[in-house]
Amino acid sequence: IRDRGNLFREIAAKRGITVAQQAKLLLTERGIDVEIDYKTCEMISGKDIETEIGVIEGRQPAYMGSFMQNLGKKNIVRIYFQCSIRDQALRFLRREIGEDAYQKGLKNVPNVNYENLESLREEIINLQLDDGHDVIEKFVENQNRDGDDRARYSSLYGFDYGNLSGYDIVVNTSNKEADQVFSEVVNELE
């Protein structure tokens, strides 16, 4: 499994800047995108993948896979995982703070369809997590990057990775743990 986000983090670390600082640079500096996209295409082509199946995770590898498929690469399956805003927030808590914060959110954040991130902000703050306000600000900043990324890729390559027609399989992961999602994907692939 290869994570495109790790490439992004590695490049930021080499430059001595934070991921957030690098994300802002992407608005004006296209070289970072081109470097990451080139490395993504190398991964899709099989470079440094020693198994029969390679998984490349990220916001846009499916479209890079389409480019590679047009160049003759075979057996590419493009999968899009989507989930509710609530689940995005809970998973962010798990990843950035830890399991206890995730469990607290799971128990206390109502399972309703939130319209946007702002409508969820108070729910996260009300969890009274250590640095809860900073956490939600980071979450909102991270999610707002998505709009910038989509506009950038549209400008660079002419695609919107949020357009689900570019995927072979779309899986809703809301209210599901990883093992359940894995089983669903395997069933779809069979």
Outline where the language-model segments fall.
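Short glycine-/polar-rich loops that comprise or flank the Walker A/P-loop
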Residues: 72-77, 165-167
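ATP-dependent small-molecule kinase phosphotransfer cores
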Residues: 4-74, 85-90, 94-136, 140, ...
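Conserved AAA+ ATPase "SRH/arginine-finger" region at the nucleotide-binding site
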Residues: 81-83
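NTP-dependent small-molecule kinase module
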Residues: 129-131, 136, 140-190
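Short, well-ordered beta-strand core segments
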Residues: 54, 78, 170-171
